Amino acid sequence: MEQKIVNIGDIQVANDKPFTLFAGMNVLESRDLAMQICEHYVKVTDKLGIPYVFKASFDKANRSSVHSYRGPGLEEGMKIFQELKDTFGVKIITDVHTEAQAQPVADVVDVIQLPAFLARQTDLVEAMAKTGAVINVKKPQFMSPGQVGNIVEKFAECGNDKIILCERGSCHGYDNLVVDMLGFGVMKNASKGSPIIFDVTHSLQMRDPSGAASGGRREQTVELAKAGLATGIAGLFIEAHPNPDQARCDGPSALPLDKLEPFLAQMKSLDDLIKSFENIDIK
């Protein structure tokens, strides 16, 4: 099956191309921290030769508690993103939660993300599709891999075929997520070769049934990322923080920022190896 290529500026995202890193921080905590984290990612990815897109949320609209930090909001968030682009020349990905956010966000960033909990909301899909932007679709935790084809088709019917699909784990009983490694191939087939990326960070979440925030298993970041890359995918989605225990959202799943370079060096070596193999077509 031919693998589709989605272009983000000069970056080619495809399952048979060198992996692209979609990474940054969970939520914009401050302008200064965003600048610090983005600068570190840019330095490391430039050194290793890894195509890179910076990720952060300007509004975490789906926090478990109404008291949890959500972010700086649309206006301030777009100002920070624009400064990051102007300073580092970096591409940006962020999520939208309402139809009204789609165009203002697409005017600034390079990829707009459809959140997992909202992936079947047709009005939101239509609004995002109309922007003409590259779209990253988070596969819902409650959806089987084969069903992503319906979301891709919905975007296509709305006039946008620049779709990336993102695996972020599936519900396994209550308060736990697992990643079915067979699902990557199913998603490729169901979407007719769309690029698949792997959100390692959020796949490591584990909820406290009585708590207002997610726990996590960041100590297993490396093994999970290696397993995903070994299936031959287009990219990784990672969140890092200089002090994960002090992060304002999803710290327990975040990669310590000082581990980024050794982590990515291993991921690049593995990805290069996997994609050097001749494809074996088994029917």
From Swiss-Prot:
It is an enzyme of class 2 (transferase). It is found in: Cytoplasm. The keyword Lyase does not apply. Pathway: Carbohydrate biosynthesis; 3-deoxy-D-manno-octulosonate biosynthesis; 3-deoxy-D-manno-octulosonate from D-ribulose 5-phosphate: step 2/3; Bacterial outer membrane biogenesis; lipopolysaccharide biosynthesis. It comes from the Bacteria. One of its GO terms (biological process) is keto-3-deoxy-D-manno-octulosonic acid biosynthetic process. The keyword 4Fe-4S does not apply. Belongs to the KdsA family. This is 2-dehydro-3-deoxyphosphooctonate aldolase. It comes from Vibrio parahaemolyticus serotype O3:K6 (strain RIMD 2210633). The lineage of its organism: Bacteria, Pseudomonadati, Pseudomonadota, Gammaproteobacteria, Vibrionales. The gene is kdsA.
